[in-house]
Amino acid sequence: MQYRRRVLDDQLDELMTGVAALEIVGPRAVGKTETASARARTVFRLDDPGTRAIIEGDPERLVRSPRPVLIDEWQRMPSSWDLVRRAVDAERSPGQFLLTGSASPASPPTHTGAGRIVSLRMRPMTLMERGIASPSVSLAALLRGEAERVAGTTGVGLDEYARQMLASGLPGLLGLSDRSARAELDGYLSRVIDRDLADAALPVRNAPALRRWMEAYAAAISTTTSLAKIREAAGGGRSDQPTRPTAAREGG
């Protein structure tokens, strides 16, 4: 399958010629592993129990393998972060390591990696990345003062724009029917609640209540609302709705 270039690739093109180690962060299935794998000579997938067992027995394999080295789901073995940091301290040549992860480790590394590991965020696919539209206004050019006026057109109508929003920007869902995409997204959300949070040492005591909270929070995106209204929508008059301190904490 031909690799579909992402917006982040422009940053990677530049930074991998000057930075020794890069971390790509973002939600599960957003395309981090595929993008990083396209640039790596060696790939270690630490979500694979067999690979993780080998690396736990010989951690230095991560930093002595042919580079660039991709350490995928590095948070499954938090010590890998410090191994990379020390390797960068020993050799500062650019483009040595790529780290990808979908969650924060239960036991954080002993060092933040500041000055050694640069973090980049990968976001869901834009309409341009999906091949739906071509950009006609550059935000970067506007911020640099290079554009005298803002003018642009698009052939994407409101109905198609709404459909693309509902389809999400996850690359694995491109081309699926609306029903299949909805099923995939429903399963995605269930996995986050039932497994991913627990893997990140964030056990969920009331999965149905958390799901209602997430639905209410999502419905309020890009609106002017209050935490109290989101909390009420999540509770729906039920007795198990989150308390105000819990809602404030979970809502960020």
Can you describe what each PLM-predicted range is?
Residues 32-33:
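Conserved lysine of the Walker
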Residues 105-120, 131-136:
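Short regulatory helix/loop adjacent to the ATP-binding pocket of P-loop NTPases
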Residues 27:
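P-loop (Walker A) phosphate-binding loop of NTP-binding proteins
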Residues 54-98:
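Conserved nucleotide-sensing/catalytic segment adjacent to the nucleotide-binding pocket
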Residues 1-13:
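N-terminal pre-Walker A segment at the start of P-loop NTPase domains
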Residues 21-24:
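Hydrophobic anchor at the beta1->P-loop junction of P-loop NTPases
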Residues 135-252:
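Interdomain hinge/linker elements that couple catalytic modules in large macromolecular machines
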